[in-house]
């Protein structure tokens, strides 16, 4: 059920932050329509089990948000690590990569708060595709996009 999931971490660390385009933290639970911002996901291999191969990062975004496809929009000011392969869909981004022992990678997705309303933002998940003991999940939350001028 939406809003009842819990964070879980097994042999992998996962931190999700939302920031303005200038890199300042932003509260995504209450955004003004038209706001551009980014999701920043940092994944760390604690190093105990060596190199992790074939990790899959799944990010599904709230229905009221739109993904700004940096490749199509010719945007290059949101710098982050580059995955081995990335699949960008209407409401989600799948990133696939390897992660060395003790290594950290940060992936960034540019977003826009497009449609007024309250939406559920699903949790972010990262896992090894062929080893179910390597997984991390950060819970989702409810978010609201308000008309311009409604947020004081």
What do the predicted segments below correspond to?
Residues 1-152:
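Long, domain-scale non-catalytic interaction/scaffolding regions in large secretory-pathway
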